[in-house]
C-alpha cells in the first residue's frame, strides 16, 4: 500500500515516465493495475495548443504611432511659466480664503452667545406649563 501511495505522489510530482515504469514493475500486479488507472490522468500530455499568428504591423506604421503618442504628450504639457502662474494663483486663493484672527474670534463668541440665548429661551417656556 505504501508503494502505491509513493507511486501516486511520484506521479503528481511529475517524475519521468521511465522512473515511474521501473517502480511499477516492482509492485504487485493488482497494485500496478490500480496505480495505472489513478496516475493515467496526470501522466497525460497536455492538449496541443493552437498557435494563433499575430498580425504584425509594418515597422513604419508602428514608428508613426509612437511618434503620435510622443507628440500628444508634448502638446499636453504647459510651459513652465504658466505652471508657475497657476501655483501662484492657488496660493493667492488660499490666502484670500483665510479669515483674520479677529473675525474668527468673533464667530466663536457668536456661537457661545447663541447657545446661551437658546438656553434662556427654553426656561420661560417651561415655567408657564408648570
Curated annotation (Swiss-Prot):
It is found in: Periplasm. Keywords: Periplasm, Signal. The keyword Disulfide bond does not apply. The keyword DNA-binding does not apply. Residues 87-96, 108-117 have a biased composition (Basic residues). One of its GO terms (cellular component) is periplasmic space. Proteolytic processing gives rise to the active protein. Belongs to the Asr family. This is Acid shock protein. It comes from Cronobacter sakazakii (strain ATCC BAA-894) (Enterobacter sakazakii).
